């Protein structure tokens, strides 16, 4: 990208967020007339009508990312919350990248997995398919994602908001644009 003569080899540069586009435009001097932003879309599924949360019911949070993208921050927060009526369901695993990746990388997150098991207000669900995660989002109120990762877009946040969740995210990468 940094070699200007290569720009004529490409018809278009397509980005999934304006944040990502601006980063590449600035870093590589991309020709703006060859750039466009096409944001991610949601799967064509039937979204449930979510009943309004009622006082006295538990507040259910959901986290649906890989372990290295801020889960440690969220678990630290949950450790400080001393309430039985605030529950976090964590859908995280290295398995999403395949068995070989999981075998090579999952061990380093064992202390984090152990911490989840020790917190009574945290449920470590692990890996589930995207449709299973979307279904679970429809039974929670808050999508919690204190990301330490510069996301180019956050499809999980978009899915969670479509499921009627409030999104609590950091202002990092393109998260401000997604949420």
Where does each model-flagged region fall?
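Short glycine/acidic-rich beta->alpha loop that forms part of the nucleotide-sugar donor binding site
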Residues: 151-154, 161, 171
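Nucleotide-activated donor-binding/catalytic signature segment of Leloir-type glycosyltransferases, i.e.
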Residues: 102-131
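Short alpha-helical segment that forms part of, or immediately flanks, the ligand-binding pocket
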Residues: 134, 157-162, 176-177
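Nucleotide-sugar-dependent
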Residues: 68, 148-155, 176-177
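A short, active-site helix/loop in glycosyltransferases that binds the activated sugar's phosphate group
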Residues: 3, 9-35, 42-45
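Short acidic/histidine- and often glycine-rich active-site loop of Leloir-type glycosyltransferases
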Residues: 171-179
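Conserved donor-binding/catalytic core segment of Leloir-type glycosyltransferases
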Residues: 53-69, 75-79, 89
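Acidic donor-binding loop of glycosyltransferase active sites
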Residues: 138-152, 165
């Amino acid at each position: 990208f940094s070699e200007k003569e290569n720009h004529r080899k490409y018809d278009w540069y397509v980005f999934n967020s304006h944040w990502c586009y601006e980063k590449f435009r600035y870093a590589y001097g991309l020709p703006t007339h060859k750039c466009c932003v096409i944001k991610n879309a949601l799967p064509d599924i039937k979204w449930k009508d979510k009943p309004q949360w009622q006082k006295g019911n538990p507040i259910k949070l959901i986290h649906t990312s890989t372990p290295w993208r801020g889960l440690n921050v969220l678990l630290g927060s949950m450790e400080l919350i001393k309430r039985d009526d605030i529950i976090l369901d964590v859908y995280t695993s290295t398995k999403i990248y395949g068995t070989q990746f999981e075998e090579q990388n999952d061990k380093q997150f064992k202390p984090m997995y152990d911490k989840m098991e020790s917190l009574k207000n945290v449920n470590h669900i692990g890996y589930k398919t995207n449709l299973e995660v979307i279904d679970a989002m429809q039974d929670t109120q808050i999508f919690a994602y204190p990301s330490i990762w510069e996301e180019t877009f956050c499809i999980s946040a978009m899915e969670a908001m479509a499921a009627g969740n409030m999104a609590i995210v950091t202002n990092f990468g393109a998260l401000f644009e997604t949420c």
